[in-house]
A protein has these predicted regions:
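Low-complexity, charge- and small-residue-enriched intrinsically disordered regions
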Residues: 336-343
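Long, contiguous internal "core" modules enriched in hydrophobic/ aromatic residues
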Residues: 1-329, 337
Length: 343
């Protein structure tokens, strides 16, 4: 049985394991508000002395280092969440537009089973994917007592797809796209990527569907508060020459499990979307890493490895980010001085 330890005892346990506490009051606050398990168990693996049989922290390691890693990961998690919300909006809009344009705005038309592929058999629900999704959507359309569904039932006597799909999850949307037939699936991929249907290759289409699963995995991880920077999704991208060349992952790297299911691959998968809001949000992760790196200068190597980032690319990106902010600060100061003298 795991015994209870109050906050002061938790701090003493850490000190007995060779961890330095620079500010006991701040440490007590962190443990009270975020929890021992979240901060210590979540990130201690990166600061432990692997040569010791008993759990011992490396010399001169601090509790503040653990908290900084925790805060960095929390910032990455929040950005992943925001980025996937942008992707979800693009997917939902494209799906609703395609169904309305091709099948109409009445549920009896755009929720007609004949218009979709069966999909995989889901043993949990004892139904094919198509039947489970369509039954769920019909039930939402008929019975869910929320706005704007209520208003549309009363005023318009039907619920168009752009209203109905507001009530679905990213997982529902992803699975619904998978059961679409060729023309509708191609249209959605075209709308999301900005490529015309004639430009899309079979490889482009396959990559897009795989990317949806990767995005969903990272979204679920973020939503449940899991550690992000070393997360490896259970779903992996196949090797796609154009995509992997673009993100500087060689076939050899791929065989060594790079460019499959890590944070670096997830970052760049969002660049496939014409709406770059999600991808741009994730670039703010570099700012968070840069801020952490200012205090813990060797951690970027650990982060590069855990995130699946090629070391030279992360180093270049961080340097570019430093120069951007340095130049931005000088530019801001120069304009402020000019404004003073121009008054």
């Amino acid at each position: 049985m795991k015994p209870f330890s109050d906050f002061n005892k938790q701090i003493k346990i850490l000190e007995n394991r060779n961890l330095t506490i620079l500010d006991r009051k701040a440490a007590n606050f962190a443990l009270r508000n975020y929890g021992y398990y979240e901060i210590v168990n979540g990130y201690k693996i990166f600061l432990l002395d692997s040569s010791k049989k008993v759990e011992t922290f490396l010399e001169k390691e601090t509790f503040e280092h653990l908290v900084s890693l925790y805060n960095l990961d929390k910032q990455i998690r929040n950005l992943v969440m925001q980025a996937t919300l942008e992707v979800e909006l693009s997917l939902r809009t494209s799906l609703a537009y395609t169904l309305a344009e091709d099948f109409g705005v009445l549920e009896s038309d755009y929720l007609d089973r004949k218009k979709y592929k069966k999909g995989k058999f889901q043993h949990k629900h004892k139904k094919y994917q198509r039947d489970f999704l369509l039954d769920m959507l019909k039930d939402i359309a008929a019975n869910r007592p929320v706005e704007p569904l209520n208003s549309y039932r009363i005023k318009h006597k039907h619920i168009p797809p752009w209203i109905l799909f507001k009530e679905t999850t990213l997982g529902n949307i992803t699975n619904f796209i998978k059961i679409l037939k060729g023309p509708q699936k191609d249209k959605i991929i075209s709308l999301c990527t900005g490529l015309s249907s004639s430009q899309l290759t079979p490889a482009d289409k396959a990559l897009f569907i795989e990317v949806l699963d990767l995005i969903l995995a990272f979204r679920n991880r973020a939503a449940h508060g899991g550690r992000m920077f070393n997360y490896k999704a259970s779903t992996s991208l196949s090797y796609h020459q154009n995509f992997h060349n673009e993100i500087k992952i060689t076939p050899g790297d791929y065989r060594n499990n790079k460019g499959k299911n890590d944070l670096y691959t997830f970052f760049h998968s969002l660049a496939l979307f014409e709406n770059k809001a999600g991808f741009d949000l994730l670039q703010l992760c570099l700012y968070s890493i840069k801020e952490h790196d200012a205090s813990y200068t060797k951690d970027w190597l650990v982060l590069a490895k855990e995130m699946g980032y090629p070391e030279y690319i992360l180093k270049t990106d961080l340097e570019r980010h430093r120069n951007f902010h340095k130049n931005y600060r000088w530019s801001y100061l120069w304009h402020a001085i000019k404004n003073i003298f121009n008054k």
